[in-house]
């Protein structure tokens, strides 16, 4: 209730004292009137006898009621107090474990393992039996309705946002593929030149503090910049053919090192179920099989940590980078259909779907181009035109945080989930899955599941954006992070207080 609504409330009027109703026994009393002398003495005696008996009965009833009330009142006070005390004690007991972070028993410093399952849409964990993921959920902390990715909901922008706490416009990886208008160079997922990768990722933050970090295939981790030189045996160059089991076992092997040599921050990356999602969409049995496979890898990690006696000492944070939605040929928008209003040559287009990115020649007027495209889309003459909306990048919804970078093209189109933009019609037919759409779509949400001494058991927290994870990890490790777009106080809301 707001303060205004409180101030508008008026006190209830003081109730007027009501007249006492006549006692029911009073009707038995003779009126003291002159007519009463007409009553015979025998009648009076009889009446007095009845009156006397009634008074005795009434008195007895009143006394019984008084004793009963007193008994109930005085006996209920201790019981209530006892119940309250018991409840308080019980509440304290049930939450005492989670009032502060649990002490380490074997490790001498906090450790975080950040696990990414690419394309793990929120809800996949319910598709099949996932005993190991469920174990983390039941004994840890989960984003109740999933983790919100940053826009665009693509692999490289989101993985780098997770480890820098920055939106893509600020960490520089604005898409999986794009052109830098200043240098004319093209970024691909194999680009390791540090000039692309802005911000300070967690592995760099950790090494800045003289601590050790290890990375296994996390996007950006192969880039040598700052204090991070991708050290041999602690930084694996991407090779998609490496079995998942080998990846897990490598991470586990670090716990065989002396305590002071164990990396305090480790990453682990799996391509599934994104790999299957693109081929068959989110609802195919192949997704169920892939999710079961990821659960098996989580089980391998858990059991390996248990065998080394460190499972309860390690903080495991399991995330995805984005969700997935089904796409089919009937959900297509063709740029060539806009020719009546404006021709958009393919040379202008840096990305078609699921984010339309157009960089027209420098001597053109982006505002005029947007106006003509919008006119065509709204005309009703362009198939599925109503499912595409184009913006000057500075006019995009502020919540997307997708304008403050020269790398972002001047014109950006937002596409309805499940739809795709192509240059021209073709006979090619395909149905599968995609992501990259507006992060407001629930289908783009992924998972956040955390287990370890820093996290409460069985706790659900509201959904949040993945830029908050950077500060969460630095708080667990008790190190100072670099400036970022996360909320400084967020870690306090999701972590248990330290001792």
PLM feature segments, named:
Residues 313, 322-367:
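Acidic/histidine-rich catalytic neighborhood
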Residues 2-5, 11-80, 94-95, 152, ...:
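His/Asp/Glu-rich, glycine-adjacent segments
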Residues 30, 76-83, 91-142:
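Active-site-proximal N-terminal segment of extracellular/periplasmic enzymes that hydrolyze or transfer
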Residues 114, 132, 293-335:
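Metal-dependent active-site segment of extracytoplasmic phospho-/sulfohydrolases and closely related
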Residues 122-170:
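Short, structured active-site-proximal loop/turn typified by the sulfatase FGly-forming signature C/S-X-P-X-R
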Residues 347-460, 464-472:
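Active-site neighborhoods of enzymes that stabilize oxyanions during catalysis
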Residues 108-113, 139-143, 170, 208-214, ...:
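Loop/turn elements at helix/coil->beta-strand transitions in domains of secreted/extracellular proteins
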Residues 112-116, 123, 143-146, 161-163, ...:
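Structural recognition of the beta-strand scaffold that forms the well-ordered cores
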């Amino acid at each position: 209730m707001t303060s205004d609504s409180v101030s508008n409330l008026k006190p209830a009027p003081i109730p007027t004292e009501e007249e006492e109703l006549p006692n029911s026994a009073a009707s038995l009393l003779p009126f003291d009137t002159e007519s009463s002398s007409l009553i015979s003495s025998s009648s009076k005696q009889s009446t007095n006898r009845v009156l006397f008996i009634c008074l005795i009965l009434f008195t007895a009833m009143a006394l019984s009621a008084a004793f009963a009330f007193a008994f109930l009142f005085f006996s209920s006070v201790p019981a209530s107090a006892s119940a309250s005390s018991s409840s308080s004690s019980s509440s304290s007991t049930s939450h005492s474990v989670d009032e502060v972070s649990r002490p380490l028993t074997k490790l001498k410093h906090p450790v975080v393992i950040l696990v990414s399952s690419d394309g793990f849409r929120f809800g996949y964990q319910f598709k099949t039996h996932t005993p190991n993921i469920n174990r983390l959920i039941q004994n840890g902390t989960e984003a109740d309705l999933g983790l919100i990715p940053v826009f665009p909901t693509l692999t490289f922008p989101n993985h780098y946002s997770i480890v820098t706490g920055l939106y893509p416009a600020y960490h520089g990886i604005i898409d999986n593929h794009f052109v830098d208008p200043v240098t004319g160079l093209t970024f691909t997922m194999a680009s390791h030149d540090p000039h692309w990768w802005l911000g300070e990722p967690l592995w760099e933050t950790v090494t800045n503090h003289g601590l050790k970090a290890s990375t296994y295939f996390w996007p950006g981790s192969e880039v040598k910049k700052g204090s991070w030189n991708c050290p041999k045996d602690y930084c694996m160059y991407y090779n998609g053919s490496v079995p998942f089991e080998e990846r897990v076992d490598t991470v586990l092997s670090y716990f065989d090192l002396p305590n002071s040599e164990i990396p305090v921050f480790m990453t682990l990356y799996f391509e599934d179920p994104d790999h299957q999602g693109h081929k068959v969409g989110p609802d195919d049995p192949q997704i169920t099989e892939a999710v079961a496979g990821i659960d098996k890898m989580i089980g391998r990690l858990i059991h390996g940590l248990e065998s080394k006696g460190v499972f309860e000492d390690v903080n495991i944070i399991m995330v995805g980078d984005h969700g997935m939605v089904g796409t089919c040929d009937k959900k297509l928008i063709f740029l060539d259909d806009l020719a009546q209003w404006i021709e958009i040559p393919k040379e202008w287009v840096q990305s078609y779907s699921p984010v339309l990115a157009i960089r027209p020649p420098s001597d053109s007027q982006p505002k005029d181009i947007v106006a003509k495209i919008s006119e065509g889309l709204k005309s009703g003459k362009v198939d599925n035109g109503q499912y595409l909306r184009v913006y000057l990048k500075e006019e995009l919804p502020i919540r997307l945080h997708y304008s403050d970078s020269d790398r972002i093209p001047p014109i950006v189109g937002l596409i309805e989930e499940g739809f795709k933009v192509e240059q021209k019609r073709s006979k090619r037919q395909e149905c599968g899955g995609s992501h990259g759409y507006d992060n407001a779509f629930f289908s783009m949400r992924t998972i956040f599941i955390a287990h370890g001494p820093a996290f409460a058991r069985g706790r659900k927290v509201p959904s949040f954006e993945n830029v908050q994870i950077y500060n969460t990890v630095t708080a667990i490790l008790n190190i100072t992070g670099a400036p970022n777009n996360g909320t400084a106080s967020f870690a306090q809301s999701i972590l248990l207080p330290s001792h």
